[in-house]
């Protein structure tokens, strides 16, 4: 009887432990997955400033290329894809928040014309779904800004080329949309940023000396990183500069350094880039009219040739008489 009670107690304990772990994982996962885009979403009403600069560049200081491909034109209420390319060397590893090395992640923000938005899942063709991967990774910048879509951070090895499933608006149902050429803006990054929105540095950037003087002591901290004591012999003051785990020191004890002189290397291997393109919302009636015009031109050419041959036959008959 005691063994049975003990077994029942053990089963309950295991089930409760597993349940707690699952709940903790669910709570923690969104904060990890959506940590980077949420910085911009919380701090800026619109990710594109009046100058054309995308706000992600405030945290990602290095410049890297990005590319975007879209159809030249689309019809109303049509699903199409925008292919965003964020190239980087897949062999390199970045400094993580804990100072260790890990894989590089990527992220992107796509600013579409008003009315354009993410395509509903049931409208996306099967072959496009295979290219997209997990549609849940895409999210609107704000509930009221469905034309601005963000994704990331996601693993760079799987998503250095991101396919956005989009749908065009219909001027027949949306009177604010017209058959025009529209701009599309892209911002894309690979790797972690160098500055947080509050202005503080991450551990993925260079650390500089706060004063000029002699490095009198370098203490390795228990949880990683360094405490660097710099003594200003002229003013007789001493300052301790803290370097978090991640960057590597390039100075040594006894060395005389200048103010703002780098104490560490630059661990950043990523960067941010902007791009833009254009897309035409095409009127189907215009295409139909164009086709009718081409058909009429071809028919006119055919009739002209037939008329010419008929005229030549009449001339030949008159000559034979």
UniProtKB/Swiss-Prot annotation:
The chain crosses the membrane at residues 287-306. Residues 1-35 form the signal peptide. One of its GO terms (cellular component) is chloroplast thylakoid membrane. PROSITE patterns: CYTF. Binds 1 heme group covalently. One of its GO terms (biological process) is photosynthesis. InterPro entries: Cyt-f_TM (IPR024058), Cyt_f (IPR002325), Cyt_f_lg_dom (IPR024094), Cyt_f_lg_dom_sf (IPR036826), Rudment_hybrid_motif (IPR011054). One of its GO terms (molecular function) is heme binding. Its main location: plastid. The keyword Cytoplasm does not apply. Keywords: Chloroplast, Electron transport, Heme, Iron, Membrane, Metal-binding, Photosynthesis, Plastid, Signal, Thylakoid, Transmembrane, Transmembrane helix, Transport. It is found in: Plastid, Chloroplast thylakoid membrane. The keyword Plastid applies. It is a single-pass membrane protein. Heme binds at residues 36, 56, 59-60. It holds the Pfam family Apocytochr_F_C. Its cofactor is heme. The 4 large subunits of the cytochrome b6-f complex are cytochrome b6, subunit IV (17 kDa polypeptide, petD), cytochrome f and the Rieske protein, while the 4 small subunits are PetG, PetL, PetM and PetN. The complex functions as a dimer. Belongs to the cytochrome f family. Component of the cytochrome b6-f complex, which mediates electron transfer between photosystem II (PSII) and photosystem I (PSI), cyclic electron flow around PSI, and state transitions. This is Cytochrome f. It comes from Psilotum nudum.
């Amino acid at each position: 009887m005691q063994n049975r009670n003990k077994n029942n107690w053990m089963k309950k304990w295991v089930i409760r432990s597993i349940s707690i772990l699952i709940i903790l994982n669910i709570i923690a996962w969104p904060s990890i997955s959506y940590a980077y885009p949420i910085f911009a979403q919380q701090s800026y009403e619109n990710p594109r400033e009046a100058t054309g600069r995308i706000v992600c560049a405030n945290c990602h200081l290095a410049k890297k290329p990005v590319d975007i491909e879209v159809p030249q034109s689309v019809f109303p209420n049509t699903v199409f894809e925008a292919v965003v390319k964020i190239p980087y060397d897949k062999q390199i590893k970045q400094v993580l928040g804990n100072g260790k090395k890990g894989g590089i992640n990527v992220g992107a923000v796509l600013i579409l014309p008003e009315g354009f938005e993410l395509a509903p899942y049931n409208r996306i063709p099967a072959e496009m779904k295979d290219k997209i991967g997990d549609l849940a990774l895409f999210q609107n910048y704000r509930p009221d800004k469905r034309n601005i879509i963000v994704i990331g951070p996601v693993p760079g090895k799987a998503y250095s080329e991101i396919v956005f499933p989009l749908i065009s608006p219909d001027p027949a149902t949306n009177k604010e949309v017209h058959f025009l050429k529209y701009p599309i803006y892209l911002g894309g990054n690979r790797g972690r940023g160098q500055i947080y929105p509050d202005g503080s540095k991450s551990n993925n950037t260079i650390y500089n000396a706060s004063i000029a003087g002699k490095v009198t002591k370098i203490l390795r901290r228990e949880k990683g990183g360094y405490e660097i004591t710099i003594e200003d012999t002229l003013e007789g003051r001493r300052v301790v500069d803290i370097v978090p785990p991640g960057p590597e020191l390039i100075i040594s004890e006894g060395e005389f350094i200048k103010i703002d002189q780098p104490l560490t290397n630059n661990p950043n291997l990523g960067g941010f880039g902007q791009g833009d393109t254009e897309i035409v919302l095409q009127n189907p009636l215009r295409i139909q009219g164009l086709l009718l015009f081409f058909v009429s031109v071809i028919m006119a050419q055919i009739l002209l040739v037939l008329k010419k041959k008929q005229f030549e036959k009449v001339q030949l008959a008159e000559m034979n008489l």
